[in-house]
Amino acid sequence: MGLELVTSGKNLPEEINVVIEIPKDSEPVKYEVDKASGAIFVDRILSTPMRYPCNYGYVPNTLCGDGDPADVLVVLPLPLVPGSVVRCRPVGVLRMSDEAGSDEKILAVPIEKIFSGYAHIEDIDQVSSHWMERIGHFFEHYKDLEKGKWVKLDGWGGAAEAKRILVESVERYNSDAP
């Protein structure tokens, strides 16, 4: 099944659709969904023996400055199946850069209908410091043993910044569409 029919979300930027590529606590394998076919490809095996601290995916029909769809970290105590789509609310953004340039990660929680445990979270300051520390540690170190690769964390931004990034990424996608 191709994912081209999955929208960015019904009420963007307040609610977004996230296509899961990597489940929370999965082995150190980086998967990527092929946007045209929907097939899940192994991108690479991470050199560090680290597990992803949360579900990792992207928002369809978005395009960020790095040429990829908007990356999303879905905070949830359970792993989700790669290729599944989960409706979320953006609550913050991890500002970071790597050897390829700027590479922000939107932090999101599932909508209340999917998981009511995070219904109270509206902005980054309401996310547990434990979650934020785990996420920051993972992304600061997951490329440590890969030659020529590096990551620099540039801090956290709130929900308003995350929503601005999402709106800009949809506009960029639409302006680049044939």
Swiss-Prot record:
Residue positions annotated to bind Mg(2+) 2 are: D71
Matching entries from SUPFAM superfamilies are given as: Inorganic pyrophosphatase
Which GO BP terms apply?
phosphate-containing compound metabolic process
One function term, GO molecular function aspect: inorganic diphosphate phosphatase activity
Instruction: Identify the keywords attached in UniProt to this record, alphabetized.
Output: Cytoplasm, Hydrolase, Magnesium, Metal-binding
Instruction: Give binding positions for Mg(2+) 1.
Output: D66, D71, D103
Q: Which reaction does it catalyse?
A: diphosphate + H2O = 2 phosphate + H(+)
Q: What is its EC number?
A: 3.6.1.1
User: Where would you find this protein in the cell?
Assistant: Cytoplasm
Question: Which amino acid positions bind substrate, per UniProt?
Answer: K30, R44, Y56, Y142
Main site of residence? Answer: cytoplasm
Q: Which domain of life is it from?
A: Bacteria
Leading EC class = hydrolase
Any Pfam family: Pyrophosphatase
Detail the disulphide connectivity of this chain as listed in its UniProt entry.
none
Cofactor(s), by name: Mg(2+)
Task: Give me the Gene Ontology terms describing cellular component.
Answer: cytosol
Similarity comment text for this entry: Belongs to the PPase family.
Q: Which NCBIfam families match?
A: PRK01250.1
Relate the assembly described in the record. Answer: Homohexamer.
Biological role stated in the UniProt entry: Catalyzes the hydrolysis of inorganic pyrophosphate (PPi) forming two phosphate ions.
Q: What is this protein called?
A: Inorganic pyrophosphatase
